[in-house]
Amino acid sequence: MLLRKGTVYVLVIRADLVNAMVAHARRDHPDEACGVLAGPEGSDRPERHIPMTNAERSPTFYRLDSGEQLKVWRAMEDADEVPVVIYHSHTATEAYPSRTDVKLATEPDAHYVLVSTRDPHRHELRSYRIVDGAVTEEPVNVVEQY
């Protein structure tokens, strides 16, 4: 999907999935956490939380473990799912994609969610579309159920 000028995208996501991403980010802090929310192909609805391993084990960089990523992507394909959300945390900065994050963004249909855990008492969660190096922030609508 190509983003058209003037198109507004919104991430609609269940609260339990937000809580799962934040818990994963807190658990892995001070290292960056990363993972995927899978959903039925064509639905744009995240349904299943898949926490993944940060192969870098770093507070300033993340990289999905390539072997684990291959297994997860194959399992999603077998289940007719796609990566609706690809997320990771920033441990000392705001929830905004770095230049490296933008370079690593290879799924044009995914919502890229960043969770900042720099404040131990609250989190910051923001969502973006990243296509061909262009970063567009989108609203996040947290719901109890779809």
Curated annotation (Swiss-Prot):
SUPFAM superfamilies: JAB1/MPN domain. Inhibited by EDTA in vitro. It is an enzyme of class 3 (hydrolase). Zn(2+) binds at residues 88, 90, 101. It catalyses: [CysO sulfur-carrier protein]-Gly-NH-CH2-C(O)-S-L-Cys + H2O = [CysO sulfur-carrier protein]-C-terminal Gly-Gly + L-cysteine + H(+). Disruption phenotype: Strains lacking this gene are shown to be attenuated in macrophages. It holds the Pfam family Prok-JAB. Keywords: Amino-acid biosynthesis, Cysteine biosynthesis, Hydrolase, Metal-binding, Metalloprotease, Protease, Zinc. One of its GO terms (molecular function) is zinc ion binding. Its cofactor is Zn(2+). Transmembrane segments: none annotated. Its EC number is 3.13.1.6. Induction: Up-regulated under oxidative stress conditions. GO terms for cellular component: cytosol. SMART domains: JAB_MPN (SM00232). CDD domains: MPN_like. Belongs to the peptidase M67A family. Protease that hydrolyzes the covalent CysO-cysteine adduct synthesized by CysM to release L-cysteine and regenerate CysO. This is CysO-cysteine peptidase. It comes from Mycobacterium tuberculosis (strain ATCC 25618 / H37Rv). The gene is mec.
